[in-house]
Amino acid sequence: MALLVETTTSGREYKVKDMSQADFGRLEIELAEVEMPGLMSCRTEFGPSQPFKGARITGSLHMTIQTAVLIETLTALGAEVRWCSCNIFSTQDHAAAAIARDSAAVFAWKGETLQEYWWCSERALDWGPGGGPDLIVDDGGDVTLLIHEGVKAEEVFEKTGQLPDPSSTDNAEMQIVLTIIRDGLKTDPKRYQKMKTRIVGVSEETTTGVKRLYQMQASGTLLFPAINVNDSVTKSKFDNLYGCRHSLPDGLMRATDVMIAGKVAVVCGYGDVGKGCAAALKQGGARVIVTEIDPICALQALMEGLQVLTLEDVISEADIFVTTTGNKDIIMVSDMKKMKNNAIVCNIGHFDNEIDMHGLETYPGVKRITIKPQTDRWVFPETKSGIIVLAEGRLMNLGCATGHPSFVMSCSFTNQVIAQIELWKEKTSGKYEKKVYVLPKHLDEKVAALHLGQLGAKLTKLSKDQADYISVPVEGPYKPAHYRY
């Protein structure tokens, strides 16, 4: 690619959209710090001991203002950091500029092409001749995937001399990944194997990335230990639920200015993300219908006063469609053709394959009208009616708005810091094998406790007699590992 890495006056590499936005980014970072008590407590507690001294951390996670506070927490604890975004639309350019100028190497801008996206991922992993990172903070698992695919290709090349063939897959992103790996083999045929040897572990932020990790663990191909941050209670029950409850309507209204009240809204999936989305739409006055495969989740939706139907039942009736499943092929182009004129179609799951964007883009005679960035009207030739697709089927809350608010992200990112400290602290102990782990309950409770004071909460204290009666320590943890909250 023709992209060139730039360098700050202090010698730090970067590639962002506009460094003149750095002062603006710094002002918003300072505001966010006040709303992120968990991360600021980590700086206070761990800063003096510098637990990351000598550690290289590569991050692939939405380059937002909130992520900037996470990055500067990692650097405040002694780490060197290189960062890219995990979505082509999610970067906040002023945040990227501030971090690139002040704290860490950043390769991210809003509106990357897929080629640029993977170039940025490669740059975030490029620590020069000394090898790759020690630790990875991942969101969706793309950097983890790149390393695993790279190692696999290098091993095949070493045995057979065969280079990866990008034409062997129909997936456009995988074609780019294989091209990057193929070109890299010509200059350093052991790059990813050397990287694998150095990596201590990864902490994964989201449901989709965790699913990939468990698949690799099951197949015996996971190359290094992983901590599943997503399934910490203080992540999934807060970020996924309350974060989406906040950011879904924000994205809808910024993109379309539509009035939610009175509309028929379909939420595909009723997991934690779906629950947050359905709650937001219901509170906004929409009539909410849920589609589900799981009878337990379906029953939960019914108990909240929601209808549970199939997509086919409501496809021509609904005004708003939101996919939240983490699966693929949820809304196909054949479904979109049946929707009412100007129905809004959007996704808040991690990848863009929940909505059949390829089928829509290649539909004969379809016309795309860009209303504004990340808001497109697609008109079908047969009916002359159209649908409005947000963020090209990618994360609409980050593509059309600014994602989750700082406070709830403080919960998620405090888990990330604790997971990274745990992996680095135990790097030579053998405690973590090439498996997927979750953080223990007492750390989950600690993350929650760090956020109570800011909201004016006061915890009731157990007496020793009461604690003995329910068989828990006075200081916690208070729930068994299987408790579902």
Curated annotation (Swiss-Prot):
It catalyses: S-adenosyl-L-homocysteine + H2O = L-homocysteine + adenosine. Its cofactor is NAD(+). One of its GO terms (molecular function) is adenosylhomocysteinase activity. Its EC number is 3.13.2.1. InterPro entries: Adenosylhomocyst_ase-like_sf, Adenosylhomocysteinase-like, Ado_hCys_hydrolase_NAD-bd, NAD(P)-bd_dom_sf, S-Ado-L-homoCys_hydrolase_CS. It comes from the Eukaryota. NAD(+) binds at residues 206-208, 240, 269-274, 292, 327, 348-350, 397. One of its GO terms (biological process) is one-carbon metabolic process. Binds 1 NAD(+) per subunit. Pfam families: AdoHcyase, AdoHcyase_NAD. It is an enzyme of class 3 (hydrolase). Belongs to the adenosylhomocysteinase family. Adenosylhomocysteine is a competitive inhibitor of S-adenosyl-L-methionine-dependent methyl transferase reactions; therefore adenosylhomocysteinase may play a key role in the control of methylations via regulation of the intracellular concentration of adenosylhomocysteine. This is Adenosylhomocysteinase. It comes from Medicago sativa. The lineage of its organism: Eukaryota, Viridiplantae, Streptophyta, Embryophyta, Tracheophyta.
